[in-house]
Amino acid sequence: MEVIEGLYYSKDHEWVKVEGDKAYIGITDYAQHSLGNIVYIELPEVGAELSAGDVLGVVESVKAASDVYTPVDGKVLEVNNAIVDDPSLVNNDPYGSWMALVELKDKSQLDNLMTAEEYKKFLDEE
């Protein structure tokens, strides 16, 4: 499973890429691999105010449907409609296929997430 350095990871297998006071959120390689071929993605509304643990969206595959949770508080600034039009993009490039861009409300929440090294250890225990 690919794990990218410089990102933050949740125990629910979401990744967070921070750029200034904004963060891109998507699902990890482990998550997309576990789901199998993704056939449908539901994203949040732009402008939605989300708290850590809220449902960010839904990913459905031929095997299962899974909620995706936001690991941080934030306001949705943008969503990636390309993955709605072609959900297989997430299977092919999970770290390039972000779901939402949010304005971070509290950067200290990042301390609750895992580094790439910590996430690799977490996966080894799964």
UniProtKB/Swiss-Prot annotation:
Q: Which SUPFAM superfamilies match?
A: Single hybrid motif
Query: Is Magnesium found in the keyword set?
Result: no
- UniProt xrefs under InterPro entries: 2-oxoA_DH_lipoyl-BS, Biotin_lipoyl, GCV_H, GCV_H/Fam206, GCV_H_sub, Single_hybrid_motif
What's an example Gene Ontology biological process for this entry?
glycine decarboxylation via glycine cleavage system
What superkingdom heads the lineage?
A: Bacteria
PROSITE patterns in the record: BIOTINYL_LIPOYL, LIPOYL
Q: Which residues carry this modification: N6-lipoyllysine?
A: K63
> Where do the Lipoyl-binding domain residues begin and end?
22-103
Provide this UniProt record's keywords sorted from A to Z: Lipoyl
- Kindly state one GO CC term assigned in the UniProt record: cytosol
Entry cofactor note text? Binds 1 lipoyl cofactor covalently.
One matching Pfam family is GCV_H
Cofactor dependency: (R)-lipoate
List the CDD domains hit by this protein, alphabetically: GCS_H
Relate the assembly described in the record.
The glycine cleavage system is composed of four proteins: P, T, L and H.
- Family as reported in the entry's similarity comment: Belongs to the GcvH family.
Q: What is the stated purpose of this protein? A: The glycine cleavage system catalyzes the degradation of glycine. The H protein shuttles the methylamine group of glycine from the P protein to the T protein.
Q: What is this protein called?
A: Glycine cleavage system H protein
Starting at the broadest rank, the lineage of the source organism is: Bacteria, Bacillati, Bacillota, Clostridia, Thermoanaerobacterales
